[in-house]
UniProtKB/Swiss-Prot annotation:
EC number of this enzyme: 2.6.1.-
Protein source organism: Arabidopsis thaliana
Single annotated GO MF: L-tyrosine-2-oxoglutarate transaminase activity
Protein name per the record: Probable aminotransferase TAT3
Names of required cofactors: pyridoxal 5'-phosphate
The organism's taxonomic lineage, starting at the top: Eukaryota, Viridiplantae, Streptophyta, Embryophyta, Tracheophyta
Keywords associated with the record: Aminotransferase, Pyridoxal phosphate, Transferase
């Protein structure tokens, strides 16, 4: 008996009949957020430098990438109107759904209606809703790109969907290895995910390649989940082409948001669009599953949904042009600075998104085992946090976010250069190592 008259319970864990859900830990372990902020917590001040954390893909913190005044005013006006203080309908506010449909329609041969669109709390929630809606069959599997965006992996793990990977080919402008994709599929495959414009590779797929992807999906009898959040961050020569153009070949679920194009990821507004002119999603119950799942989840802010039509319709093209111009400058600057850091190689200059996807050559560095080791030591020595490629499914690659001010890009490469200079194996050592290997080969022969 405790002094306050309350009996102390045995503190051993087996007294209690509840415990945390281990599936959440398994899923969170593969997220970028877990990795990046874990590395952030391991930063030390030994370098005497401020922490550079250009990894979450959020350029909104920098002056050249602030969202436009028209978007800010749309949100303020929605809040002042008094018309957006209630709960929103589960599928989304009708005017927001209609505005997204009109925004996406463009050159689509079959136009979307408001009823084909569902509003979500950013694209990540859209991913969760779609993945969970496909996870009813315990033997089902999904095809994900390698490299790719790990939130798909995380949600598939949490939902119990088996993950199978297909490769993107650096020697072919990061096109999908369609033979490998077909080999990875079986009778339990339900969907493939395509990210276009591509995070992390920065490529934009051509019309011909997307047509081949659609034909392969039809052959396999699977849907295409097309992640198009970077559709407004294209600065190369290839135009962005929506996957929905090919929905008559295979049904397409398009995922998107205003986070990247309008540089406001904290606003959390995204969407799911059902490109399905043949009614396949209805006949297979996918539409019903998504609508049921929307009834289980919290709705996005009514204020943001009320503002969404004005955000999509009233943003001037000059806003996007300014942002694209800044990204082009940063890409050129980064590629120039990479010439002084030969352990990092960019196989293809990016055409979109806000990243450099770089191959890491550890043979040029002392005491660096792999990409994770590289990034961990970079944090410790330079207070610079980058994403190791293994987190995106590709060992010995590194992702650098360059969606930031030019001065920050310069500082990123100053620190990378300093790190490389300290760890670089001298050319003489490389020659000696090669000579030793040749001597071994000769002696064996």
């Amino acid at each position: 008996m405790a002094s306050n008259g309350v009996t102390n319970c045995n503190a051993n864990a087996n007294v209690w009949r509840f415990k945390g859900n281990g599936a959440t830990s398994d899923a969170a372990a593969v997220t970028l957020r877990k990795l990046a902020f874990g590395m952030f917590k391991n930063c030390t001040m030994n370098s005497g430098k401020t922490i550079l954390f250009p990894t979450p893909g959020e350029p909104s913190a920098h002056s050249n990438f602030r969202t436009c005044p028209e978007a800010e005013e749309a949100v303020a006006a929605a809040a002042r109107s008094g018309m957006a203080n209630s709960y929103a309908p589960s599928p989304g506010v009708f005017k927001a759904r209609r505005a997204v449909a009109e925004y996406l329609n463009g050159e689509l041969p079959t136009k979307l209606k408001a009823e084909d669109v569902y509003i979500t709390g950013g694209c990540n929630q859209a991913i969760e809703i779609v993945i969970d809606s496909l996870a009813g069959n315990p033997s089902a599997n999904i095809l994900l790109p390698r490299p790719g965006y790990p939130h798909y992996d995380a949600r598939a793990v949490y939902s119990g969907l088996e993950i199978r990977k297909y490769d993107l080919l650096p020697e072919s402008d990061w096109e999908i290895n369609l033979d490998g994709l077909e080999a990875a599929a079986d009778e339990n495959t339900v969907a493939m995910v395509i990210i276009n414009p591509n995070n992390p590779c920065g490529n934009v797929y051509t019309y011909d390649h997307l047509n081949k992807v659609a034909e392969m999906a039809r052959k396999l009898g699977i849907m295409i989940i097309s992640d198009e959040v970077y559709d407004h961050v294209v600065y190369g020569d290839k135009p962005f082409i929506p996957m929905g153009k090919f929905a008559s070949i295979a049904p397409v679920i398009t995922l998107g948001s205003i986070s990247k194009g309008w540089v406001n990821p904290g606003w959390r507004v995204g969407w799911i669009a059902m490109n399905d002119p043949n009614g396949i999603f209805v006949s297979t119950g996918v539409v019903q599953a998504i609508e049921d799942f929307l009834d289980l989840t919290p709705q996005p802010s009514f204020i943001l949904q009320e503002a969404l039509p004005d955000i999509l319709e009233k943003t001037p093209k000059e806003f996007f042009e300014k942002k694209i111009k800044a990204m082009r400058r940063n890409v050129e600057l980064s590629c120039e600075r990479l010439k002084d850091i030969p352990c990092l190689f960019c196989p293809k200059k990016p055409e979109s998104c806000s990243y450099l996807w770089l191959k890491l050559d550890t043979s040029m560095l002392n005491n660096i085992k792999n990409d994770f080791d590289f990034c961990t030591k970079l944090v410790s020595e330079e207070s610079l946090i980058l994403i190791p490629g293994v987190a995106l499914g590709a060992e010995n690659w590194v992702r650098i976010s360059i969606g930031t001010d030019e001065s920050v890009v310069q500082e990123i490469f100053d620190r990378l250069k300093g790190f490389y200079d300290r760890h670089a194996i001298s050319k003489e050592a490389i020659k000696l190592s090669g000579h030793a290997i040749n001597q071994i080969v000769v002696s064996v022969n």
